[in-house]
Amino acid sequence: MADKLFINALKKKFEESPEEKKTTFYTLGGWKQSERKTEFVNAGKEVAAKRGIPQYNPDIGTPLGQRVLMPYQVSTTDTYVEGDDLHFVNNAAMQQMWDDIRRTVIVGLNHAHAVIEKRLGKEVTPETITHYLETVNHAMPGAAVVQEHMVETHPALVADSYVKVFTGNDEIADEIDPAFVIDINKQFPEDQAETLKAEVGDGIWQVVRIPTIVSRTCDGATTSRWSAMQIGMSMISAYKQAAGEAATGDFAYAAKHAEVIHMGTYLPVRRARGENEPGGVPFGYLADICQSSRVNYEDPVRVSLDVVATGAMLYDQIWLGSYMSGGVGFTQYATAAYTDNILDDFTYFGKEYVEDKYGLCEAPNNMDTVLDVATEVTFYGLEQYEEYPALLEDQFGGSQRAAVVAAAAGCSTAFATGNAQTGLSGWYLSMYLHKEQHSRLGFYGYDLQDQCGASNVFSIRGDEGLPLELRGPNYPNYAMNVGHQGEYAGISQAPHAARGDAFVFNPLVKIAFADDNLVFDFTNVRGEFAKGALREFEPAGERALITPAK
């Protein structure tokens, strides 16, 4: 690769040439060099005057702006933003990405239909299914169907709530009102669509989106309960049941338990979170939630790094950065993986190396390949930091660099072998090589999991090993070290992207997010982050309708 993908960003960030070894500090104007910090200062003064309590004051504590307060290019875009605009609190797109995951649950109709036909002796047809879907799309946002004197939600406040279905049977899908159908044939390339339909078969599955405002006010575990209540009421109404008859219990069981797929599993009590919270979302699920693979299927690097960006934001910025630690600094561990095209450059190098030497997914799935590919990519990355001092200043933390280099090594190894476990092994080897070269990786404890992780890559034992696609933020040793989990998710995607697989872990999850009615566009994760940073993203769940006009 003659042109480094990160060069333009370095030239935009710094006055000096990227190869220059000298710069200046302390004479840059402090926080005033940043438009966003200046805006914050003015806003903080207004807040303080209004409430009578001092607020934002960057002159307290360590002075800001001793170095360049650099802009960031959101990778794969031409958009440059300030770092503050990539904090999830300041970015509506990032918030909505998590909202759209948390408020989703997949519920089968197969058990319910069996109850209707076998217990109640009623017929289930495409017409009755469409009638049920009309009913549940009335009820799911928070409206009543079988009770009188019920309070209801304002439709404009919950406009993002709806229910769709999908099936692997084209004949059934064609008979249901298309407004309610996720059309697998339209949303996926032909070969992916055929694979997914074969996985689903004749089953019919509902994709439920509860209102953003509900999951924000409550929590992720509310999603399946809210969903089950409205599904149960809609079944009673659509199939004209007596609400107290015995079969009602079967419907409740089907809607709440029997065929329910959460986006995240229940966490142990010491972390005190229910289903559909970030700590329970497996890496393979997150890879399937990201939809890059159905539009960028010829570019495994783009597909894998879109998953990295998705995971870096969710796992590092929201889960570890706030749920677990309560801090604000974790943002910059995440942004290193999706800004300035640095990880992109390193990973495209690795992909080209693999293609030239082996072919994608053609290398032996063994340690010789891990040693070859991960070493080559790691040394390439470290050489870039040596050659371009501005790159070191861009990723000023050792843990940022360690995560980026190891992610490129891991993805590239997975491209070679077609296996996520050897990709993970490539990650750990990269960490060892990096520490050997630079004597350190990051802050104290950053590399805890990297020092012990290699021991359970290929051993599948209780609490000591799992296929990477099944691991998640709550996997032992992964629980608190930033700069890892999003990258692991990308490595879990990498072999499947290189092979052109239709999904990574769960075909139902992949299909559920192939939905044009979602507020967040999961086919273009980094582009959506950029829109949020520019304040151009329109989120759901806003309360302007019920607040005083200004």
UniProtKB/Swiss-Prot annotation:
Pfam families: MCR_alpha, MCR_alpha_N. GO terms for molecular function: coenzyme-B sulfoethylthiotransferase activity; metal ion binding. InterPro entries: Me_CoM_Rdtase_asu (IPR016212), Me_CoM_Rdtase_asu/bsu_C (IPR008924), Me_CoM_Rdtase_asu_C (IPR009047), Me_CoM_Rdtase_asu_N (IPR003183), Me_CoM_Rdtase_asu_N_sub1 (IPR015811), Me_CoM_Rdtase_asu_N_sub2 (IPR015823), Me_CoM_Rdtase_Fd-like_fold (IPR009024). Keywords: Cytoplasm, Metal-binding, Methanogenesis, Methylation, Nickel, Transferase. GO terms for biological process: methanogenesis. Methyl-coenzyme M reductase activity is inhibited by 3-nitrooxypropanol (3-NOP) in vitro and in vivo, by oxidation of its active site Ni(I), which stops both growth and methanogenesis. Is also inhibited by the reaction product CoM-S-S-CoB. It is found in: Cytoplasm. Coenzyme M binds at residues 333, 444. The modification (Z)-2,3-didehydroaspartate is found at residue 450. Its EC number is 2.8.4.1. Coenzyme F430 binds at residue 147. The modification S-methylcysteine is found at residue 452. It comes from the Archaea. The alpha subunit contains six modified amino acids near the active site region. Is methylated on His-257, Arg-271, Gln-400 and Cys-452, probably by the action of specific S-adenosylmethionine-dependent methyltransferases. Also contains a thioglycine at position 445, forming a thiopeptide bond. Contains a didehydroaspartate residue at position 450. The methylation on C5 of Arg-271 is a post-translational methylation not essential in vivo, but which plays a role for the stability and structural integrity of MCR. The modification 1-thioglycine is found at residue 445. The lineage of its organism: Archaea, Methanobacteriati, Methanobacteriota, Methanomada group, Methanobacteria. The modification 5-methylarginine is found at residue 271. It catalyses: coenzyme B + methyl-coenzyme M = methane + coenzyme M-coenzyme B heterodisulfide. It comes from Methanothermobacter marburgensis (strain ATCC BAA-927 / DSM 2133 / JCM 14651 / NBRC 100331 / OCM 82 / Marburg). Its main location: cytoplasm. This is Methyl-coenzyme M reductase I subunit alpha. MCR is a hexamer of two alpha, two beta, and two gamma chains, forming a dimer of heterotrimers. It is an enzyme of class 2 (transferase).
